[in-house]
C-alpha cells in the first residue's frame, strides 16, 4: 500500500482508537492468528480492521502472509505512537477518576514469575481488595523480567511492578514487600538425593553439575550461584526447575516454589544450613507519577495485607 498523497490524519475518532488498540494487540501477540483469542475476533475480521486502519493512516503497517508477520518501518513508528497515545488516554482517565473518587480504568502490573506460590500472598490479597472496591477496574498482569518491569514503570506502560531489589534506578521508588528464601535442590535420581546431609561433603556439592540463572540477581544471591559448578543456564526459575528435575543438575529454587515437589518426594534441599540465600522483593512505582486513584488504592491494600 503506497503512502497517501495527503499525510494529514485530521481528527482521531473513537473508531480510530479502537483500530489502534487492535493493532497494538496484534503486534504484542506477534501475529493475526495469535491475537484471535485475545481480541475475541476471527482472523478475517482482524484482517479487515487492519485494512481499515492502513487506509485511514494512508500507509502500510505490516507485512503478512506465508513469510509471517512483520512490521514495516512506518508500522514500528505507529506502534510507538499508539503506546504513547493509549498511555496518555489512561493518564487522562486516571485524573478524572481522582476527581470523582470512583475506581475505574486499568491497573497494569508487571510481576516476575513464580511468585503465586508465596504463602504470604500479599499481591493476591491486594488485587482482591482492589477489585472489591472497584468492580469496573480492569487488571492487566504481565509476567516478565525485572529489567523489563522497571523500564515499563519508567516509561508509563506499567503502573506498578514487583521486582527483586538489585540495582535501584533513580527514577523509581522501591517499597519493601517481603523476603523470598531460596535453597539448593537436587531431584530424585541424582547421586546426592538418597544420602543424608551428614554424609555429604560441601566439596561434593560444589563439584556437582549445576544450573545457573541467566537473569540478574542481587550480589549475595549471585555469589551463591557462582560458587557452584555451573554447566547449564536458564532464563527463568521454571527453566531452572526443568533442569533440576532431570536428575542431572543441582540448582537454587525459591523454597515456596519447590515446596510441592519436596512434599511429593521429587526434590530435596542440599545442606540447607550452608546453601541458602534470601532476596528482598519490592513494589516499584515511578517517582513524580501523576495522581492515580486505582494505583493508590492498590498500594494501600498491599500495605495492610
Swiss-Prot record:
It comes from the Bacteria. Keywords: Activator, DNA-binding, Transcription, Transcription regulation. This is HTH-type transcriptional activator BauR. GO terms for biological process: positive regulation of catabolic process; regulation of DNA-templated transcription. GO terms for molecular function: DNA-binding transcription factor activity; transcription cis-regulatory region binding. Belongs to the LysR transcriptional regulatory family. Involved in the degradation of beta-alanine. BauR activates the transcription of the bauABCD operon. Pfam families: HTH_1, LysR_substrate. Disruption phenotype: Cells lacking this gene grow normally on putrescine, cadaverine, and GABA, but growth on beta-alanine is completely abolished. The keyword Ribonucleoprotein does not apply. Residues 15-72 form the HTH lysR-type domain.
Amino acid at each position: 500500500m503506497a503512502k497517501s498523497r495527503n499525510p494529514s490524519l485530521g481528527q482521531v475518532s473513537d473508531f480510530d482508537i479502537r483500530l489502534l488498540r487492535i493493532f497494538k494487540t496484534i503486534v504484542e501477540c506477534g501475529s493475526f492468528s495469535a491475537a484471535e483469542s485475545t481480541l475475541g475476533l476471527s482472523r478475517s475480521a482482524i484482517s479487515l480492521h487492519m485494512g481499515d486502519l492502513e487506509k485511514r493512516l494512508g500507509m502500510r503497517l505490516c507485512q503478512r502472509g506465508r513469510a509471517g508477520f512483520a512490521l514495516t518501518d512506518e508500522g514500528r513508528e505507529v506502534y510507538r505512537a499508539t503506546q504513547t497515545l493509549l498511555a496518555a488516554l489512561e493518564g487522562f482517565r486516571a485524573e478524572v477518576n481522582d476527581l470523582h473518587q470512583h475506581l475505574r480504568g486499568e491497573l497494569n502490573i508487571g510481576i516476575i514469575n513464580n511468585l503465586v506460590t508465596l504463602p504470604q500472598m500479599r499481591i493476591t490479597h491486594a488485587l482482591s481488595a482492589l477489585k472489591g472496591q472497584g468492580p469496573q477496574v480492569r487488571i492487566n498482569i504481565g509476567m516478565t523480567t525485572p529489567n523489563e518491569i522497571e523500564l515499563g514503570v519508567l516509561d508509563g506502560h506499567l503502573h506498578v511492578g514487583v521486582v527483586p531489589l538489585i540495582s535501584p534506578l533513580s527514577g523509581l521508588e522501591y517499597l519493601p514487600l517481603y523476603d523470598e528464601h531460596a535453597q539448593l535442590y537436587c531431584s530424585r535420581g541424582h547421586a546426592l538425593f538418597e544420602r543424608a546431609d551428614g554424609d555429604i561433603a560441601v566439596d561434593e556439592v560444589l563439584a556437582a553439575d549445576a544450573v545457573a540463572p541467566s537473569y540478574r540477581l542481587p550480589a549475595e544471591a549471585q555469589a551463591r550461584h557462582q560458587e557452584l559448578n555451573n554447566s547449564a543456564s536458564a532464563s527463568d526459575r521454571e527453566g531452572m526447575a526443568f533442569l533440576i528435575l532431570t536428575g542431572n543438575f543441582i540448582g537454587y529454587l525459591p523454597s515456596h516454589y519447590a515446596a510441592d515437589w519436596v512434599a511429593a518426594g521429587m526434590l530435596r534441599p542440599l545442606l540447607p544450613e550452608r546453601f541458602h540465600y534470601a532476596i528482598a522483593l519490592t513494589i516499584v512505582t515511578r517517582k513524580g507519577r501523576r495522581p492515580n486513584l486505582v494505583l493508590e488504592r492498590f498500594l494501600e491494600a498491599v500495605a495492610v495485607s
